[in-house]
Amino acid sequence: MTERLISLLREKNMKIATAESCTGGLLASKLTSVPGASRVFEYGFVTYSEGAKQKLIGVNEETLRRHSVYSSAVAEEMAVGCMEAAGADVGIGITGVAGTEPEIVMVDGVPTTVDPGTVYIACCCKRDGCTTVKVQRFMKSACARIGDGFREIIRENASDFAIEIAIEEIERCTNDTKS
């Protein structure tokens, strides 16, 4: 699947950038493990803190306050921000809770619980200014029998899902629906 994304980017003469939080650079690592990725991979941002998201890729403070760092709105701003900062054609933003405990965040001033395994992934394509936001939630109970590896399962699944979303978005943006 990763090879397919790199091949598609090369075929379409497009560049990609990533902005990752809960995956901690795993997506960028997967992309750059494919021979020839240097022709299409521009930047990989690991923006774990809110400050890094604001400073490096332009996530709006108001968006963080109104929606929290764990939201589709922030994932979308991460995708657009990394794409613009890198001068790329495609941007992917990933944010979420990969840990085993719920996170309490403020959403418009109201304390809100975000469950473990809640991951927001956004992909945008510069060709037509379109942005697709997909929400994927990986359930802790489904992974419980595996043991202590829940965090790694979330990170792996989120980065793989981001690759799938990118392929779909590039095909949609370039009006190429061939599989």
Task: Please annotate each region the language model reported.
Residues 1-179:
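Short alpha-helical segments enriched in small residues
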